């Protein structure tokens, strides 16, 4: 067994020490990726089963580590309630983490699947086969559960992963990572298959973005706008961009009001700090007289601040005026911007101008309007008569997700095990030569 990685402390030759540390862990991860690429599904599933057990049996230690992280965050005056919510683990959330590992274990192994096969006129058979990406670098901020989600999804898809969690969740991630390593060890897989960067030093992020001399094949950022922007600007390897969720719910004139109220309330208030939370409510002008006031009152009475245009402000004195920035803001809090638009075309135009290509929903009983919305809104996830909070890999049946990719290349939407694979072509011949 290789010696454990040593954390970088102090200031003496810090950059040199950190570079050596990162180069070492990258080399170990690359070696582990070669082993994982050939690991049979049964061995990977044994590791996942052991990880699930370890999370449950070490729940108290995970929660204790998280309590220290949360206490430190609360002592900082600039941490919002939504940030604290994303950072906080509860017994139910730890159990959900374990259950997610079990679900990932139960899904089909994507590696080695022949997605397409055909025979050429010369008798050669060509197969397109799923293969792992290699080494995935995951850079995330406050959510400690990302360590588990990313670790198990990369394992399932035959990839090694280097995890760099936020400094705010450092202790929590370390406790979770120990459980994942225990599972790898019990299954006889290399411990470097899931590596946690053992330092809070922010310079480690820049080193990962450099690709660590070709050791990292793809970067997945999970965090706020500034993190994602930095990754996209500095990364020298491909990026699965997880942009902010400026998500919209459009209530069409044909919408059932009871359904609309239920969807809007859930989309905004179920958990305000998740990337699938609705941030803007759009209401068809033709429904304003009947639907707007009930929707606004419902949100305010649920504890949500509503910032509206002139029409919305007239429905309730408690509505605050919206400014131009509100239409582009991911609040991650109990705040929503609200606007009246001219039908589905007006909603689509607003989303095109202000959306983040993440998740947008229409509430409508008009199939033509719904079809138009689903076709023309250029977001990774578009929903008809359902809450935006279904923007989640677990809800898609992926077991978990490594992020919601909002770009257009390779992966889009929830990134599960299958999306963490590429492909190669296998060609079978009987001695053919090209004329």
UniProtKB/Swiss-Prot annotation:
Pathway: Amino-acid biosynthesis; L-proline biosynthesis; L-glutamate 5-semialdehyde from L-glutamate: step 2/2. It is found in: Cytoplasm. Its EC number is 1.2.1.41. It comes from the Bacteria. GO terms for molecular function: glutamate-5-semialdehyde dehydrogenase activity; NADP binding. Keywords: Amino-acid biosynthesis, Cytoplasm, NADP, Oxidoreductase, Proline biosynthesis. Catalyzes the NADPH-dependent reduction of L-glutamate 5-phosphate into L-glutamate 5-semialdehyde and phosphate. The product spontaneously undergoes cyclization to form 1-pyrroline-5-carboxylate. It comes from Bradyrhizobium diazoefficiens (strain JCM 10833 / BCRC 13528 / IAM 13628 / NBRC 14792 / USDA 110). This is Gamma-glutamyl phosphate reductase. It is an enzyme of class 1 (oxidoreductase). Pfam families: Aldedh. GO terms for cellular component: cytoplasm. GO terms for biological process: L-proline biosynthetic process. InterPro entries: Ald_DH/histidinol_DH, Ald_DH_C, Ald_DH_N, Aldehyde_DH_dom, G-glutamylP_reductase_CS, Glu-5-SA_DH, GPR_dom. It catalyses: L-glutamate 5-semialdehyde + phosphate + NADP(+) = L-glutamyl 5-phosphate + NADPH + H(+). Belongs to the gamma-glutamyl phosphate reductase family.
């Amino acid at each position: 067994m290789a010696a454990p990685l040593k954390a970088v402390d102090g200031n003496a030759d810090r950059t040199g020490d950190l570079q050596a540390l990162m180069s070492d862990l990258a080399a170990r991860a690359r070696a582990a990726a070669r082993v994982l690429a050939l690991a049979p599904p049964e061995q990977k599933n044994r590791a996942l089963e052991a990880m699930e057990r370890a999370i449950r049996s070490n729940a108290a230690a995970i929660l204790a580590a998280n309590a220290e992280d949360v206490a430190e965050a609360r002592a900082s005056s600039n941490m919002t309630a939504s940030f604290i919510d994303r950072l906080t683990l509860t017994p139910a959330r730890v159990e959900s983490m374990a259950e997610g590992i079990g679900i990932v274990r139960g899904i089909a192994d994507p590696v080695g699947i022949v997605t397409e096969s055909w025979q050429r006129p010369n008798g050669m058979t060509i197969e397109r086969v799923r293969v792992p990406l290699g080494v995935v670098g995951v850079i995330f901020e406050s959510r400690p559960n990302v360590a588990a989600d990313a670790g198990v999804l990369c394992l399932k898809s035959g990839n090694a992963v280097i995890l760099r969690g936020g400094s705010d969740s450092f202790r929590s991630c370390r406790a979770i990572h120990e459980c994942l390593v225990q599972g790898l060890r019990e299954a006889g897989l290399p411990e470097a298959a899931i590596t946690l960067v053992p330092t809070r030093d922010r310079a480690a992020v820049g080193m990962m973005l450099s690709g660590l001399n070709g050791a990292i094949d793809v970067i997945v950022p999970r965090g706020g706008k500034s993190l994602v922007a930095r990754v996209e600007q500095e990364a020298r390897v491909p990026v699965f961009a997880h942009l902010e969720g400026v998500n919209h719910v459009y209530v069409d004139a044909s919408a059932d009001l009871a359904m609309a109220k239920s969807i809007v309330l859930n989309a905004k208030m179920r958990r305000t700090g998740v990337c699938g939370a609705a941030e803007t409510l759009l209401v068809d002008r033709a429904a304003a007289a009947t639907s707007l006031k009930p929707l606004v009152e419902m949100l305010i009475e649920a504890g949500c601040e509503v910032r509206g245009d002139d029409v919305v402000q007239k429905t309730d004195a408690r509505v605050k005026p919206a400014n131009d920035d509100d239409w582009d803001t991911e609040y991650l809090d109990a705040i929503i911007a609200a606007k009246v638009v001219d039908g589905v075309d007006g909603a689509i135009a607003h989303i095109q101008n202000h959306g983040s290509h993440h998740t947008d929903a229409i509430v409508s009983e008009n199939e033509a309007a719904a079809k138009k919305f689903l076709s023309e809104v250029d977001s990774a996830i578009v929903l008809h008569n359902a809450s935006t909070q279904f923007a989640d890999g677990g809800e898609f049946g992926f077991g978990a997700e490594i992020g919601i990719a909002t770009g257009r290349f390779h992966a889009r939407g929830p990134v599960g095990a299958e999306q963490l694979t590429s492909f190669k072509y296998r060609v079978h011949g009987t001695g053919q030569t090209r004329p």
